[in-house]
């Protein structure tokens, strides 16, 4: 199937002014377009324009937007809906039907204006939002086009076994967009279409073998919006280097599964072992301390990290397992008293009310910081990683601590979601305890961590839209030619 390309006339009808990277994507006729762009660079907007163009320019076309989750798919789906409703006011030979809850959009095409006598429906174009976390639901369809959003987070098997076969009958096209996540299949597909020569941030660029069906596009966020470069460079000061390079620089980083890429900047301190405690320094009356408390149950360890807020160094770390709730709280109270009644930041999620009641009963000054979601965990860990890269994290020079930090990694779930956890059957109690403690630390550059509020999921509801407006375009074929290059 020959891919039609949208024209400037079509862009004008949408009120859309593509920047140079978006325009290159639209002008490409490759069957597999791979766009690796930084955040807020217009990937989703360009993808939505491509979908709308197909729905109008090729009556009867069938296409999907597929993302790691339905919430992510809904972003581009929603943009497509907005644009389709706008265009339906221009073309009286079309009728739009939206089923919001099912993420299903229909564009009915007629042989004359819909409200004209004898109007006959000649074709129906369909666009649907899909999630990659249920691959079996992607099988069996026959499609003209597919858009993959955040493709680097989707397992390759979902593409090869479920998605690509849907394009085989009609020789359909795929637009594969994402920020990079290491050197996975998205990286390999990107190299198959990259013809830009050697470029920093793209390993093996310049020596890669290309495929005639592929064309790739690459740009950091500041390449697209050069006037905002200063803002992006400022952001670099507040997020981990690895995250910045991937999310904004659109770099393919080979060691991206390691959460703490700044381990070489970690300050290691001599300590004295006293029972279950690793003591770097005893209490200093003129200093303020806080304790990050990660409680363990069953085979997990409980870890209490005492942070000197004046120096930014861990003064003491206590690690134990097999202790009852009462025993854990008793030890935490003793540790707090030994460091001037240091206040405690405690992860109370998943341990029930028993811990909170025990903390209250013991009169411990504590702030609950429940790590109740992957979002909260990621924010805490990212803050610790950022401080580490700045050389502002100091811990006892202990093999167990270093191994746990080194083995804390990014993983991809079967549904394509990225999670942080210990390697294999390892523990992450030390990591979480340190992250809780350092969430209270004001860095040497004045940076202070603040936990962002989680946004509630949007409610979905059934919605039906019918738009019939007459305009100069009265003939469907003429209308199609008007915005097809």
From Swiss-Prot:
<feature type="binding site">
    <location>
        <position position="294"/>
    </location>
    <ligand>
        <name>Mg(2+) 2</name>
    </ligand>
</feature>
<dbReference type="GO" id="GO:0098009">
    <property type="term" value="C:viral terminase, large subunit"/>
</dbReference>
<keyword id="KW-0378">Hydrolase</keyword>
<dbReference type="GO" id="GO:0004519">
    <property type="term" value="F:endonuclease activity"/>
</dbReference>
<feature type="binding site">
    <location>
        <position position="97"/>
    </location>
    <ligand>
        <name>ATP</name>
    </ligand>
</feature>
<comment type="similarity">
    <text>Belongs to the Tequatrovirus large terminase family.</text>
</comment>
<feature type="binding site">
    <location>
        <position position="347"/>
    </location>
    <ligand>
        <name>Mg(2+) 2</name>
    </ligand>
</feature>
<feature type="active site" description="For ATPase activity">
    <location>
        <position position="150"/>
    </location>
</feature>
<keyword id="KW-0255">Endonuclease</keyword>
<keyword id="KW-0460">Magnesium</keyword>
<feature type="site" description="Possible stabilization of Magnesium 1">
    <location>
        <position position="428"/>
    </location>
</feature>
<keyword id="KW-0231">Viral genome packaging</keyword>
<feature type="binding site">
    <location>
        <position position="429"/>
    </location>
    <ligand>
        <name>Mg(2+) 1</name>
    </ligand>
</feature>
<dbReference type="Pfam" id="PF17289">
    <property type="entry name" value="Terminase_6C"/>
</dbReference>
<dbReference type="InterPro" id="IPR035421">
    <property type="entry name" value="Terminase_6C"/>
</dbReference>
<dbReference type="Pfam" id="PF03237">
    <property type="entry name" value="Terminase_6N"/>
</dbReference>
<comment type="subunit">
    <text>Interacts with the terminase small subunit; the active complex is probably heterooligomeric. Interacts with the portal protein.</text>
</comment>
<dbReference type="InterPro" id="IPR044267">
    <property type="entry name" value="Terminase_large_su_gp17-like"/>
</dbReference>
<keyword id="KW-0540">Nuclease</keyword>
<feature type="binding site">
    <location>
        <position position="99"/>
    </location>
    <ligand>
        <name>ATP</name>
    </ligand>
</feature>
<comment type="function">
    <text>The terminase large subunit acts as an ATP driven molecular motor necessary for viral DNA translocation into empty capsids and as an endonuclease that cuts the viral genome to initiate and to end a packaging reaction The terminase lies at a unique vertex of the procapsid and is composed of two subunits, a small terminase subunit involved in viral DNA recognition (packaging sequence), and a large terminase subunit possessing endonucleolytic and ATPase activities. Both terminase subunits heterooligomerize and are docked on the portal protein to form the packaging machine.</text>
</comment>
<dbReference type="GO" id="GO:0019073">
    <property type="term" value="P:viral DNA genome packaging"/>
</dbReference>
<dbReference type="InterPro" id="IPR027417">
    <property type="entry name" value="P-loop_NTPase"/>
</dbReference>
<keyword id="KW-0067">ATP-binding</keyword>
<feature type="region of interest" description="Nuclease">
    <location>
        <begin position="256"/>
        <end position="438"/>
    </location>
</feature>
<keyword id="KW-0547">Nucleotide-binding</keyword>
<dbReference type="GO" id="GO:0016887">
    <property type="term" value="F:ATP hydrolysis activity"/>
</dbReference>
<keyword id="KW-0479">Metal-binding</keyword>
<feature type="short sequence motif" description="Walker B motif">
    <location>
        <begin position="145"/>
        <end position="150"/>
    </location>
</feature>
<protein>
    <recommendedName>
        <fullName>Terminase, large subunit</fullName>
        <ecNumber>3.6.4.-</ecNumber>
        <ecNumber>3.1.21.-</ecNumber>
    </recommendedName>
</protein>
<dbReference type="GO" id="GO:0005524">
    <property type="term" value="F:ATP binding"/>
</dbReference>
<dbReference type="GO" id="GO:0046872">
    <property type="term" value="F:metal ion binding"/>
</dbReference>
<feature type="short sequence motif" description="Walker A motif">
    <location>
        <begin position="124"/>
        <end position="131"/>
    </location>
</feature>
<keyword id="KW-1188">Viral release from host cell</keyword>
<feature type="site" description="Modulates nuclease activity">
    <location>
        <position position="300"/>
    </location>
</feature>
<dbReference type="GO" id="GO:0051276">
    <property type="term" value="P:chromosome organization"/>
</dbReference>
<feature type="binding site">
    <location>
        <position position="294"/>
    </location>
    <ligand>
        <name>Mg(2+) 1</name>
    </ligand>
</feature>
């Amino acid at each position: 199937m020959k891919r039609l390309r949208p024209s400037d006339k079509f862009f004008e009808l949408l009120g859309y002014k593509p920047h140079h990277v978006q325009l290159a994507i639209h002008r490409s006729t490759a069957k597999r377009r791979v766009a690796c762009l930084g955040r807020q660079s217009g990937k989703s907007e360009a993808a939505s324009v491509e979908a709308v163009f197909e729905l109008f320019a090729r009556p009867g076309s069938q296409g999907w937007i597929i993302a790691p989750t339905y919430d992510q798919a809904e972003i581009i789906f929603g943009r497509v809906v907005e644009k389709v409703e706008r265009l339906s006011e221009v073309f009286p030979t079309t009728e739009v039907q939206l089923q919001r809850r099912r993420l299903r959009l229909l564009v009915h095409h007629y042989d004359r204006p819909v409200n004209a006598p004898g109007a006959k429906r000649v074709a129906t174009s369909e666009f649907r939002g899909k999630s990659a976390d249920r691959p079996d639901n992607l099988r069996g369809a026959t499609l003209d086009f597919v858009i993959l959003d955040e493709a680097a987070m989707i397992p390759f098997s979902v593409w090869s076994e479920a998605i690509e076969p849907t394009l085989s009958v009609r020789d359909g096209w795929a637009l594969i967009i994402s920020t990079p996540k290491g050197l996975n299949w998205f990286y390999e597909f990107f190299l198959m279409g990259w013809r830009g020569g050697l470029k920093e941030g793209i390993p093996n660029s310049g020596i890669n073998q290309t495929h005639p069906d592929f064309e790739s596009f690459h740009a950091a966020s500041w390449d697209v919006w050069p006037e905002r470069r200063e803002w992006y460079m400022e952001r670099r000061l507040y997020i981990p280097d690895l995250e910045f390079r991937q999310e904004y620089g659109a770099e393919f980083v080979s060691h991206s599964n390691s959460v703490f890429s700044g381990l070489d900047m970690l300050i290691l301190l001599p300590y004295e072992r006293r029972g279950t405690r690793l003591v770097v320094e005893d209490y200093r009356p003129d200093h303020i301390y806080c304790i990050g408390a990660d409680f363990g149950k069953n085979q997990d360890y409980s870890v209490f990290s005492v942070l000197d807020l004046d120096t930014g160094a861990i003064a003491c770390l206590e690690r134990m397992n097999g202790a009852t709730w009462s025993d854990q709280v008793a030890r935490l109270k003793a540790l707090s008293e030994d460091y001037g009644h240091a206040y405690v930041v405690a992860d109370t999620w998943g341990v029930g009310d028993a811990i909170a009641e025990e903390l209250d009963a013991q009169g411990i000054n504590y702030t609950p910081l429940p790590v109740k979601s992957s979002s909260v965990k990621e924010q805490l860990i990212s803050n610790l990683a950022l401080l580490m890269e700045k050389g502002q994290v100091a811990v006892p020079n202990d093999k167990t601590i270093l191994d746990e930090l080194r083995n804390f990694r990014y993983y991809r779930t079967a549904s394509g979601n990225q999670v942080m956890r210990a390697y294999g059957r390892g523990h992450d109690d030390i990591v979480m305890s340190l992250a809780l403690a350092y969430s209270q630390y004001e860095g040497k550059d004045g940076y202070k961590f603040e936990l962002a509020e989680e946004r509630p999921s949007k409610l979905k509801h059934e919605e039906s839209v019918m738009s019939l407006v007459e305009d100069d375009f009265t003939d469907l074929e003429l209308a199609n030619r008007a915005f097809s290059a």
